[in-house]
């Protein structure tokens, strides 16, 4: 097990391991940790959720996407697999890379994945399917469930550039996603966190039984995690929706 540095240990002391925090308290703690850790880069704030599902069963799979209200705080590179009129629309909408067979072959030959989001028109998917072994493990494969297989390429590009985050439960029932940078104002981080949690709640599959969310925590890229009070967070979500 890797040894923790002095600053990490100091940051850990800020967290009460026996307490479950509100989102507001947790973001305040992350801000304090950032001051202690003194990283030389703008750390990403990450959300982790442990769900009471078994993704081996189709009716317990959790997958979706969310457009964070305040984005991710970084430029998003978008690839669009399209031809003809759709390719023209994608270029006009600001896609970073647009193409058909040539772009697909480039990814196949070079295993090139220097982009954050991949979008495809439905007619391109039989060809894009060949990229599954490359794009799939990196979470880049276009999917109708996340809105990245569509004829409305302009809207998909707009959402991606704004900071749409895709999520998918792993084999152990965990969901991880970035929700912004620690340099964001507190309220913007809180807004993004509520939006992300709400998206996972709405993605609850029909086969999920009992308490859907078992654990929830936030952290920086390289910091201790802060566990959240699930009931309090869900209560606030309901109040926001009312």
From Swiss-Prot:
Gene3D superfamilies: 3.30.190.20, 3.40.50.790. This is Large ribosomal subunit protein uL1. Belongs to the universal ribosomal protein uL1 family. GO terms for cellular component: large ribosomal subunit. GO terms for molecular function: rRNA binding; structural constituent of ribosome; tRNA binding. The keyword Protein biosynthesis does not apply. Part of the 50S ribosomal subunit. Keywords: Repressor, Ribonucleoprotein, Ribosomal protein, RNA-binding, rRNA-binding, Translation regulation, tRNA-binding.
């Amino acid at each position: 097990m890797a040894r923790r540095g002095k600053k990490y240990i100091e940051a850990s002391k800020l967290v009460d391991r026996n307490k479950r925090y509100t989102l507001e308290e947790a973001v305040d703690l992350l801000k304090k940790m950032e001051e202690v850790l003194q990283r030389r880069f703008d750390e990403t704030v990450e959300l982790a959720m442990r769900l009471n599902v078994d993704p081996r069963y189709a009716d317990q799979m959790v997958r979706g996407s969310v457009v964070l209200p305040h984005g991710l705080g970084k430029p998003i590179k978008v690839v669009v697999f399209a031809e003809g009129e759709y390719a023209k629309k994608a270029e006009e909408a600001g896609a970073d890379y647009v193409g058909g067979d040539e772009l697909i072959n480039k990814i196949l030959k070079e295993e090139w994945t220097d982009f954050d989001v991949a979008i495809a028109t439905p007619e391109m998917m039989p060809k894009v399917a060949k990229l599954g072994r490359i794009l799939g493990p990196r979470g880049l494969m276009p999917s109708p469930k996340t809105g990245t297989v569509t004829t409305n390429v302009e809207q998909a590009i707009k959402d991606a550039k704004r900071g749409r985050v895709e999520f998918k439960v792993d084999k152990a029932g965990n969901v991880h996603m970035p929700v912004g940078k620690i340099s964001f104002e507190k309220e913007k981080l809180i807004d993004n966190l509520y939006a992300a949690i709400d998206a996972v709640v709405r993605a609850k599959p029909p086969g999920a039984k009992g308490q859907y969310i078992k654990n929830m925590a936030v952290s920086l890229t390289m910091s201790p995690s802060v566990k959240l009070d699930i009931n309090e967070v869900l209560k606030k979500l309901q109040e926001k929706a009312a």
